[in-house]
Amino acid sequence: MTNQNQSQTQTTQTVEKVSSRQKKKKRVCSFCVERIYDIDYKDVNRLKKFLTERGKIMPRRTTGNCARHQRQLTRAIKRARILALLPFIVE
């Protein structure tokens, strides 16, 4: 009887593990959707969306940007930081 209970609990645990992992929706590059070919370093409001609360640049896997636009975004953020449009560190 205890063996059956143990096997039932094991199967319910595996079912819970599978159901807890849901397939995430693939993110699409927002710059490609809006047909923005060159990212401008002076557009500070758009650049702020791709920074964390600590001021770090978000990775591609979280933003959903394509490789080309992620490179342009990184360059634009770094230029904006040098020109003091964006802070290096957020307090």
UniProtKB/Swiss-Prot annotation:
Region described as Disordered: 1-24
GO biological process: translation
Gene3D superfamilies, sorted: Ribosomal protein S18 (4.10.640.10)
SUPFAM superfamilies in the cross-refs: Ribosomal protein S18
GO molecular function, one term: small ribosomal subunit rRNA binding
Low complexity composition bias: residue spans: 1-14
Keyword Ribonucleoprotein included in the entry's annotation: yes
InterPro entries: Ribosomal_bS18, Ribosomal_bS18_sf
GO CC annotation: cytosolic small ribosomal subunit
Keyword Cytoplasm among UniProt keywords: no
Keyword set, alphabetical order: Ribonucleoprotein, Ribosomal protein, RNA-binding, rRNA-binding
Its biological purpose: Binds as a heterodimer with protein bS6 to the central domain of the 16S rRNA, where it helps stabilize the platform of the 30S subunit.
PANTHER family linked to this entry: 30S RIBOSOMAL PROTEIN S18, SMALL RIBOSOMAL SUBUNIT PROTEIN BS18M
Subunit organization: Part of the 30S ribosomal subunit. Forms a tight heterodimer with protein bS6.
Family named by the database record: Belongs to the bacterial ribosomal protein bS18 family.
Listed name of the protein: Small ribosomal subunit protein bS18
Lineage: Bacteria, Bacillati, Bacillota, Bacillota incertae sedis, Caldicellulosiruptorales
Record gene name: rpsR
